Structure formats: structure tokens, C-alpha cells
Amino acid sequence: MINKRWIVWIAAAAVFGAALAAGCQRPVQTGGLAAADASAKVYVAPGEKDEFYMFASGGFSGNVSIYGLPSGRLFAQVPVFSQYAEKGYGYSEQTKALLNTSYGFVPWDDAHHPKVSQTDGVPDGRWLFINGNNTPRIARLDLTTMETAEIIEIPNSAGNHASPFVTPNSEYVVGATRFSVPTPQKDVSIATAKENFAGLLSFIKVGAQGTMSLAFQIRMPGYSYDLAHAGKGPSAGWAFFTTYNTEQAFSLLERGASQRDKDFIAAVNWKRAEECVAQGLGVRTPASYAHNWVDDRAIAVSEMKTDSIILEPKQCTNMVFFLPTPKSPHGADVDPTGEFIVAGGKLATVLPVHSFSKMQQAIASKAFDGDANGIPILKYDATIAGEVPEPGLGPLHTEFDGKGYGYTSVFISSEIVKWSLKDFKVVDRIPTYYSIGHLMIPGGDSAKPFGKYVVALNKITKDRYLPTGPELTQSAQLYAIDGEKMRLLLDFPTVGEPHYAQAIPASLIVDKQKKFFALAENRDPMATKSEKEAKVVRKGSEVHVYMTSIRSHFSPDNIEGVQVGDTVYFHLTNLEQDWDVPHGFAITGARNSELLVMPGQTRTLVWQPERVGVFPFYCTDFCSALHQEMQGYVRVSPKGSQVKLTWNAPGTAIGAN
């Protein structure tokens, strides 16, 4: 007899296949506006600016993309975990250390979930945090410069997916193990996963200036910890993590990890965890992980850390509780009041809504249904506030509009479902094109949603854009939510694979944007603050070029006396003190990238010449009518040559020094 679960899966797969097949036909724009009306609502006139910044993860690009809403225009890409040749990020000597890990230099990661820092549960626009999923890391971006300021590696973890969700006053960002592994690592059979694998929940402290430090970790059963959100209001001091694969399968998880009707939300009382750490109940355990940050000289530095504090739920009681949740839950989303915790069960037929107040009552009355590794399992009926019936096939994530409604992304049936927090009934639904993953409402995960729009982050586009070979772009779709019914306004392509996004009013940060770096405050030891200071210095086989750039020349721009086998360091300082006048630098044969140097900034490129000859360098970033003339030459002589090291001073020919 066929198991009912398999019937559900077969039906879901059939619907999914039908949805993809429908992609070959021109879809009916159900819920959309007439083209002229939609265009008017997203049109931003020349010279005018968007209302919102949207920060979207790049997924496998490893970076963050910045868009404007409602226009959908792409403004910038911010390199985070991946080397980015356009800006020399991860190539210049001042940025390479940001990509250090306990595994060495790792110039890529899988960036999933951006989160804006918060004050009183409301986005404040100071920093943006984002996780690296592959080599477990969390990065912090400075939203005044739109640059990566810090990256911390997370030890004892694998697959940092439930991250870096922020607590209401940015006390912590969190991380969690998606792929449970032996902790500490050791050589054991994969078949002993149940006995030897563990998952860890990590709490990373955020200091007043944003500096991150690993505060403590909580050892958990070897499940897969998927997503998280912190509580707010009455649930402040708690964080909620979804788990799947409570079966602890280790092969063919699409079947093995879907046997049980319910998995869990792990409700973590991080205030209680703090108490246990203060009481000395945590065990300081050897660990190896990198902490990288940009120091006050604007140079990235790296420090290897050697231990972490690990808490055991059996020793720190009343710290963690499991809330049974159907089935393979993905999102763990807390409504603006902090009362409701919504889980999107990827294989569930309902959308469960847990009540924080009921959970507290259940804990007080010990309404337990056993335990898992010493962690109490609360009875489902004791915590559930209600279930949203017929949410669609494959509900994933929920955001909130602040007006009493939740909006849930539904992957298999490709739709957004709007439902009421009062009676848990669906009030509207609208198709997406196609296979929505995350969705985002500006501030929709906070105590004060800004509302107005919901953005669908779609995995598949099929017929939506001009084809681009075997791989098609992924997309975002903008819907208006200021009325009773959702209305499709705009499609726009995205960079990489945006798993999640955050949007905040531009007014929060637009006036705080740094326009240039004050040259007088440049503390880089390789800085050259005037053309008169430009020079070339040999130290053995190293040649250091202390160079300046200003519209429209380099100083020096002719250099002789470099030899094959030398290592040449070009320390370039941009002397400009004006907004949006970066200077680039590239030289023939460099095996790294260009430099892109902001006004008042210093960056260093390493070049190792292997051939005799004369090699040009030039500015790669257009800056003036004489941009083409912004160039120079380096003469490379044979190793051991007697050619003297010479360079030209401003306005002179070479050899005039």
C-alpha cells in the first residue's frame, strides 16, 4: 500500500512540473496592473531617486547587490566573500586579509541572508550583516561606505545557513550548523552520524562600534539547522531556529530526511545562555578560526582565535526547547508584535503559527512530549495558535506588513499568499514567475515594517527575459501591497542567486554616505600624500613604488631599473578630494587584477615581471577628458643588470632626478 506521504510528494511534483511547463506559455498577469499603470508606479524620473535601498544577497556570487525600489535599478555590487577584480577586492594588499580562514585564503563563499542592524527591533541603517554558507563566516558591511568592514569565521560548524539573523538591539547575530559534523572534527565513519555528529548554534556578540566576537555556542543534536529569527517585544531574549532531518539521515536526504510528520523549531533563551556563561557552565574548548577586520589605517588585518565557549543544554537547563513543527520547516519568522512564530514547512499542507505566550505557559506547566538529547519537546497543541489552511504547495518564508497580515512565499505552486494574523485565513494570493524562494517586505521582519511593497525572489525565469544561453537570470518581482489585493508592478533581473534581501528607506542612510576619504586622515604607512613625496625604493629583490594619481596623471609615470624576478609593489594613493573620482591602475602582465582607489585612499598591487621589455600601466576608470593620457611605463631589464633605478619627478623626463 502506498504511503500517504508519497502521495503528497507525487502530487506536489506533478504540480511543480505543470508550473514549469506553463513557463513555455505566455502567462496571464493575474493580479497585475495595466502596463501603463504599473509603469507609472515604478517610474523614477531622471534626476529623481528611489524611495528604498534594497540589499540582496548574491548567493553563489559571494557578494551583495544594491538596488533601488521601486525602480529595480542595480546601483552597485559590494564584494564580500569573493574576490572582485573590478575593484581589486581580495587582490590588493589592503583587502586580502579579509578572506583569511582557518583553511587558509578562501576567496569565495555562498552568501545567503543579509540583515540590517536594528535598534529597538527596527532597522537603523548602521551595518549590514551577511552569512557565508560554505566556509562558515559572517561579514559586516559599513553602510556609510558600502564596503566590507569585518569577517569572522565560525568554528565547530558546517554550512552556516541559519545566519546572521540579528537580535532587536544588535546584541548578537547568530549562526547555526546546516550540515552536522563531528564536533570536534575526527575520523569517524559517516554511517555513525547519529552517534558522532552534532550541530552547534553560535551567538556572535556585536560591539558598540560593530566589532564582532564569538560569545558562546550551544551544542545541539546532529540535525540540520535551517533558518532563524530573533524574538522581539514579549519574545525578546529568545531566538528561533528551524530544524529538518531530525531523522539524522546521512544519504539521499530527499527521502531519508522526510520520514517524520514533524520536525522542530528550536526556541533558544539566549538571556538564559548568558547567565550560564556568567556562572561558568560553558566549557572553553579548543577551536581554530579567523577574525578579520579593517583597522583604523584602512588595512585589513587577520587574527587567528584558538577557543570557544560551548554550552550543553543538559547543564544549562531551561535554555532550549523544541516546538514540533510540520514538515521539513524552512523559515522561522516572528511577527512584528513578537507573539507569533511562523514556520514554513516545505512538505506541509498547513502553515503552523506558534504562540510565544502559549509556549511560555507550556514551559511553566511542563507540557512536554518527551525530550531529544535532554532538550524538552513541547506538545504541539500546547504552543500552536493556529494553522493557515491551504497555503499552497511548498510554503517557505513569511514577512509582515505591520497591518495584521503575513505574506508567505510558496515554492512549488509559485505564489505569494496573504493571510490574516487574526483568524489565520488566506485573504489573497498572486502568482510569481517562477518558483519563488524568499520574499521581502521593507522592514517586514522587524517590529516596524515599512510596508508598501513585497518583493518575490524567484529561482526560475523561463520565458520572462531574452535568453542568455544555457543559464538564465534569476529575478525579483515587485508587488504593491498598499491595498487589499496584491498587484504586480515590475520584473527585474538579479545578480547571482538572491536568497534573501533587506530594504530600508533611503532616508535612513542617504545623508550618511561617505563621499571621499580625507587625505589628511590617511594612516596607511604606504600612503604618498603629495606628488613631491613620490619615489621608488629598492629593498633587495623588492621594489616599492610610492605613487600618486590625480586628474590626469600618475607620479611617477616612468620607471627604469626594475629587473626580471623582482617583486614590485605599486602603492597608489588617490590625491583627489572630490566625490566619485576613483582612479584605476593596471599594468601589463599582472596576474591578479586592477586597483580601484577611492579619493584619499591608498591601495597596493603586486606585480612580478618575468620578461625583459617596456610595460605600460594606465588608469582604468574614466576621470577626465584626458583619461586616455593617464598612463606610464616600467622598463624591465635582465636580472643582474646594472641599469640604475630611476624615475621621473612631476613634469620632468626620466633621469632628471
What does each of the following model-derived ranges do?
Residues 537-567:
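N-terminal edge beta-strand
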Residues 69-73, 143-147, 203-212, 267-289, ...:
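Short loop/turn segments immediately following beta-strands, especially the blade-tip
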Residues 78-81, 110, 152-157, 216-223, ...:
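Surface loop/turn motifs at the tips and blade-to-blade linkers of beta-strand repeat domains
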Residues 56-59, 122-123, 128-134, 173-185, ...:
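Conserved beta-strand positions in repeat-built beta-propeller and related beta-rich domains
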Residues 144-264, 271-273, 280-296, 300-324, ...:
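Asp-box/WD-like beta-propeller blade repeats and closely related beta-sheet repeat scaffolds
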Residues 41-43, 86-92, 108-120, 156-166, ...:
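Repeated scaffold domains used in trafficking and secretory/extracellular systems
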Residues 515-548, 624-657:
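Extracytoplasmic/periplasmic copper-protein system
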Residues 40-52, 113-116, 125, 175-197, ...:
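Short, conserved, GDST-rich strand-edge loop motifs in beta-rich repeat architectures
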